[in-house]
Regions:
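Extracytoplasmic cell-surface/polysaccharide-interacting catalytic and binding patches
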Residues: 2-5, 10-141, 145-298
Length: 298
């Protein structure tokens, strides 16, 4: 009687184990189907769990007393590099009056890009080919106000109004690989590489997943925006949008990330910086401020 009872208990345990294993297999199968059918979710899983934050670098505010700050006239700093890389354009921030993009031709291709992104895009494109074997192509970079007006007239729900598109700056790049454009870009190895690693080259996914309430644009894994280093890596590390990053940089405060010092100050003011900086770059942000970035001398 006791042996029969023990045997029944053993069978019950085996049945429970089989049910648990079967349930786990079903869950795994469902998750696999979902990830395969929705590559943007696969991108998010990869971005969260496959090494994007393995080398976490702190981003923190640095406080300086006035006695340790030196004033600079922005217009007379010939050794500083002026860029347009951090200009914010969206539905609420239109192209500044009198804005002229700093454009140049990319590698005798006939494609016009903002000069700030030429080297970075070349490096990203080469890395895509080296790591995936695919060649990355550009479908759109610079777009005039007139071209944007025509585009919006044809598709008013998707296209931003003329004057509000990042393509006016030459800093936004729509990319694709053979047989994989638009949302299908993420189905390619190249698309997944770009969405995971573009931040290392100064680019961001300008309209990330689940941030439409902030950007006003649904997820576009093919739309890259150049903001430069270290800004792209901070944005990636914090999983925030460009809008959120601009708001993160409080005016007249100083932030330290790796070997960089970053400050956002009123555009028409005497820029105050601590000593011991080199390779200083500044860019207006289209909110009445300028973002200054410098490398800290060891």
């Amino acid at each position: 009687m006791s042996n029969k009872k023990n045997k029944n208990q053993k069978n019950n345990k085996l049945n429970i184990i089989k049910i648990i294993i079967g349930s786990l297999c079903i869950i795994l199968l469902v998750m696999t189907i979902i990830l395969v059918s929705k590559p943007e979710l696969l991108y998010r899983v990869q971005g969260s769990f496959l090494g994007r934050n393995d080398n976490h670098i702190s981003f923190k505010e640095n406080k300086y007393s006035e006695i340790n700050l030196q004033g600079f006239d922005l217009n007379s700093q010939t050794e500083w590099r002026s860029e347009q890389s951090l200009i914010l354009l969206n539905k609420a921030h239109a192209l500044p009056e009198g804005f002229v993009p700093q454009m140049a031709e990319y590698k005798d291709s006939g494609v016009q890009m903002n000069v700030a992104i030429l080297d970075a895009y070349a490096q990203l494109s080469a890395a895509v080919t080296e790591n995936t074997g695919d060649k990355m192509y550009v479908s759109s970079v610079y777009r005039s106000v007139e071209e944007q007006a025509e585009l919006q007239a044809n598709d008013p729900e998707l296209a931003l109004p003329p004057g509000n598109s990042e393509h006016h700056t030459g800093l936004a790049v729509d990319v694709y690989v053979f047989e994989h454009a638009g949302m299908n870009f993420l189905e390619s190895e190249a698309g997944q590489y770009v969405n995971k690693n573009c931040y290392d080259f100064g680019f961001i996914i300008r309209y990330p997943k689940d941030k439409e309430d902030i950007t006003g644009i649904s997820f576009e894994p093919w739309h890259l925006r150049y903001v430069g280093l270290p800004h792209s890596k901070i944005i990636q590390q914090k999983f925030i949008t460009f809008e959120e990053y601009i708001n993160l940089l409080q005016p007249n405060k100083f932030y330290h990330y790796d070997k960089y010092l970053i400050t956002r100050q009123p555009l028409n003011s005497n820029i105050k910086l601590p000593t011991g900086l080199q390779n200083i770059v500044y860019s207006p942000d289209n909110t009445g401020h300028v973002i200054v970035t410098g490398q800290i001398i060891d």
